[in-house]
């Protein structure tokens, strides 16, 4: 048993160190940037060290457990712990946040507040992935909203207030259902409120009550994931946010919804999940086709990438609802894979906008010759997005396919039908993925854009793009690096469906 509070330090350090930013000089942008990037690197190294030396990947139980009494009156505890399910998203959070702070170097207006909000998000995300208490999970879930709202409303585009308001209305509305679900689970069947995850996992509920809890949690996670028809905040938010904020949104924020579906809906409410899983499968299949088709009709580059994110989330939903260890492992791999690819595409879209000041694809064209490095990286990540063999997206989608085909819960004809419709979605993906670089980089040169702004990627942008590209290739060639972390935990989760 390791008694050193590793997880508490990892959760609290970014927001505590971030609050010291306000003591730095107001106009010292360079100092603020380096301070923030050093905090992020130190946090990532600390997390990696703690996991390498104190985490056993073959143990499906909760590790690095910490339990401190926080508020005596409510019997509220600060409970943290990690398992194979949460270690991947935590490392992804550290990696993407570090690169997002590097991407945010051009931000000079109110840079102290900007970097503090990014570090506050960092703490909230790691706190969410490592919390073992339902109320703490809810608090960390809410801690995300205010930084994202401010990052949108203060550093967004022309319609930033509209998109920020839409974001807060959708996510706060979902949070109401999450709070109701948390309180319902906590207050059921005992005089003392039970907020501990371990106690709740072993609790059994009447079927009707479990279904009500399931629907409440599902709505909250469906908004964040997002699952259609609760997805309309996402394209507006991505269309207006600064690209460093988009990296955090696409790379981590959307994954919180998928993580919640697995951690709470699957693990705590297995009976209701087995009832709803066929409907989830249908929703996921429709989502792949709908979002891919809608993405094709988008003129705005960032909105097109946003709809591609919605389409890729469809594979995660199908993997979660397949009720097989293969399908769930595929969903977890897709969570990590799309975290890298989505963040990279938004970063490249944002840096391209910085140069040519155009957002609509039909106004772009002919910039491959003056910007060959940008062209190479954007084309590579577009290929990764369409699941090219050898890249992480291909392995993830293939494993989800195998998960459906090998599933025992569904009859042969529904499985074949869903596989066929998913295959249509995979055919649509290259159409919108490849039309982006075609419209941006090929064709006639722009005569209305100033020539002096056509400079190629600098060392910072190249370093950032390659840093994301290496894991995409690495996971594509050797996916067991990610799968080995969660495979034992996945078996434990799925055993609930067959032995409970």
UniProtKB/Swiss-Prot annotation:
Entry's Gene Ontology BP terms: aerobic respiration; ATP synthesis coupled electron transport; electron transport coupled proton transport
One Pfam family this sequence matches: Proton_antipo_M
Record's catalysed reaction(s): a plastoquinone + NADH + (n+1) H(+)(in) = a plastoquinol + NAD(+) + n H(+)(out); a plastoquinone + NADPH + (n+1) H(+)(in) = a plastoquinol + NADP(+) + n H(+)(out)
Entry keyword annotation includes Lipid biosynthesis: no
Residues annotated as transmembrane: 4-24, 35-55, 87-107, 113-130, 134-154, 167-187, 208-228, 242-262, 272-292, 305-325, 330-350, 386-406, 416-436, 462-482
EC primary class: translocase
HAMAP family: NDH1_NuoM (MF_00491)
Similarity-based family: Belongs to the complex I subunit 4 family.
Protein name: NAD(P)H-quinone oxidoreductase chain 4, chloroplastic
């Amino acid at each position: 048993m390791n008694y050193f509070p590793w997880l508490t330090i990892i959760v609290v350090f970014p927001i505590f160190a971030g609050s010291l930013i306000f003591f730095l000089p107001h106009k010292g942008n360079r100092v603020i940037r380096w301070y923030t990037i050093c905090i992020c690197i130190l946090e990532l190294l600390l997390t990696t060290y703690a996991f390498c030396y104190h985490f056993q990947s073959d143990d499906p139980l909760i590790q690095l457990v910490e339990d401190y009494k926080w508020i005596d009156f409510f019997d509220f505890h600060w409970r943290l712990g990690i398992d194979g399910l949460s270690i991947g998203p935590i490392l992804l959070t550290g990696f993407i946040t570090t690169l997002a702070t590097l991407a945010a170097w051009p931000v000079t207006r109110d840079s102290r507040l900007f970097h503090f909000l990014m570090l506050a998000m960092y703490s909230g995300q790691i706190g969410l992935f490592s919390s073992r208490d339902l109320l703490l999970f809810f608090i960390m879930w809410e801690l995300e909203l205010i930084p994202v709202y401010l990052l949108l409303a203060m550093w967004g585009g022309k319609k930033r207030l509209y998109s920020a308001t839409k974001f807060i209305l959708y996510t706060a509305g979902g949070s109401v259902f999450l709070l109701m679900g948390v309180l319902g689970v906590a207050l059921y069947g005992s005089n003392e409120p039970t907020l501990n995850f371990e106690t709740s996992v072993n609790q059994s509920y009447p079927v009707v009550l479990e279904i009500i809890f399931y629907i409440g949690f599902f709505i909250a996670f469906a908004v964040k994931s997002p699952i259609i028809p609760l997805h309309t905040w996402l394209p507006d938010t991505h269309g207006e946010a600064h690209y460093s904020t988009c990296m955090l949104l696409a790379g981590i924020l959307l994954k919180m919804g998928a993580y919640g579906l697995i951690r709470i809906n699957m693990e705590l409410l297995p009976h209701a999940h087995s009832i709803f899983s066929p409907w989830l499968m249908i929703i996921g299949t429709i989502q792949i086709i709908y979002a891919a088709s809608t993405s094709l009709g988008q003129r705005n580059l960032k909105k097109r990438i946003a709809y591609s994110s919605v389409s890729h989330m469809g594979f995660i939903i199908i993997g979660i609802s397949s009720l097989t260890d293969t399908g769930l492992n595929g969903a977890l791999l897709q969570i990590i894979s799309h975290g890298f690819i989505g963040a990279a595409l938004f970063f490249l879209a944002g840096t391209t906008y910085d140069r040519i000041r155009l957002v609509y694809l039909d106004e772009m064209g002919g910039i491959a010759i003056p910007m060959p490095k940008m062209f190479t990286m954007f084309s590579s990540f577009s290929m990764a997005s369409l699941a090219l063999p050898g890249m992480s997206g291909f392995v993830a989608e293939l494993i989800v396919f195998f998960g459906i085909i090998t599933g025992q819960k569904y009859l042969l004809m529904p499985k074949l039908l869903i596989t066929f419709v998913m295959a249509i979605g995979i055919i649509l993906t290259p159409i919108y993925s490849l039309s982006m670089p075609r419209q941006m980089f090929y064709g006639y040169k722009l005569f209305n854009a100033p020539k002096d702004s056509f400079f190629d990627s600098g060392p910072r942008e190249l370093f950032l793009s390659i840093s994301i590209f290496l894991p995409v290739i690495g996971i594509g060639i050797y996916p067991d690096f990610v799968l080995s972390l969660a495979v034992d935990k996945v078996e434990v989760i799925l055993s609930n469906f067959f032995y409970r």
